[in-house]
């Protein structure tokens, strides 16, 4: 988070890092759908896992000079705002997701899958990414934001290994923010209509922030216009008005 060499001398006593690695991924239980006691037990065990990783870094991690351990590493309660220096709440890498009017699939955003789709359709499409000439993610006419990150999944509790492959700069479709069954709920983060695979690129914080902005604007627009979120997306006039509103506020909805 902080490289002290990029600041005025004395601004920071050292670098500050936020550790979110597979080594401290806790996969031994759920925080939801269980009793409060069980949930807290998993949180406590997850903290111990993080402390174990810190201890390994302090004592056994290989150093460039051939030695082991970085004993100067320490927790920062003053930065985290907690007594123990760990995070205030657990970071949930993959959330539960809604059953949405539209679900983003790997074939919409994965680079290799898009190449296969383009070959099947007999065209190469419009270029939006210079390093991948002629190839672009699926275009969504109801786009309410953009994002760009590779599809990156950590090992799972089911035994799956790393999944890490390229995606293309993509859009956030409004249909992925609309539940099929519930009409008065708008997801505002990584809980939109994606799959286990595509959540790997839509879960990133900048994308979540874009989703949150779109969700807030959608709620406000729906109230002001006395419309349901579904009616806004599924009526061309209302969708156009909503997209014009968010674009006026500086929201980018495509990569053109």
Regions found by a protein language model. Name each.
Residues 1-256:
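Flavin (FAD/FMN)-binding glycine-rich loop and adjacent Rossmann-like elements that form
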């Amino acid at each position: 988070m902080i490289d002290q060499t990029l600041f005025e001398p004395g601004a920071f006593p050292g670098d500050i890092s936020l550790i979110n690695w597979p080594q401290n991924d806790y996969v031994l239980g759920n925080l939801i759908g269980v009793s409060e006691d069980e949930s807290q037990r998993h949180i406590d065990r997850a903290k111990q896992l993080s402390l174990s990783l810190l201890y390994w870094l302090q004592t056994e991690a290989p150093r460039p000079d051939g030695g082991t351990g970085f004993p100067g590493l320490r927790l920062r309660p003053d930065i985290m705002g907690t007594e123990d220096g760990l995070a205030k709440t657990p970071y949930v890498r993959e959330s539960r997701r809604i059953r949405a009017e539209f679900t983003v699939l790997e074939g919409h955003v994965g680079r290799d899958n898009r190449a296969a789709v383009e070959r099947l359709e007999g065209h190469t499409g419009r270029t939006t990414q210079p390093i991948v000439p002629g190839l672009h993610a699926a275009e969504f006419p109801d786009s309410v934001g953009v994002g760009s990150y590779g599809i990156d999944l950590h090992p799972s509790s089911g035994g799956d290994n790393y999944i890490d492959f390229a995606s293309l700069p993509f859009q956030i479709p409004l249909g992925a923010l609309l539940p099929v069954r519930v009409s008065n709920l708008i997801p505002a983060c990584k809980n939109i209509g994606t799959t286990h695979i595509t959540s790997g690129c839509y879960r990133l914080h900048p994308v979540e922030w874009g989703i949150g902005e779109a969700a807030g604007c959608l709620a406000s627009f729906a109230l002001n216009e006395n419309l349901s979120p579904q009616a806004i997306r599924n009526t061309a006039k209302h969708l156009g008005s909503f997209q014009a509103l968010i674009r006026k506020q500086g929201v980018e909805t495509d990569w053109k």
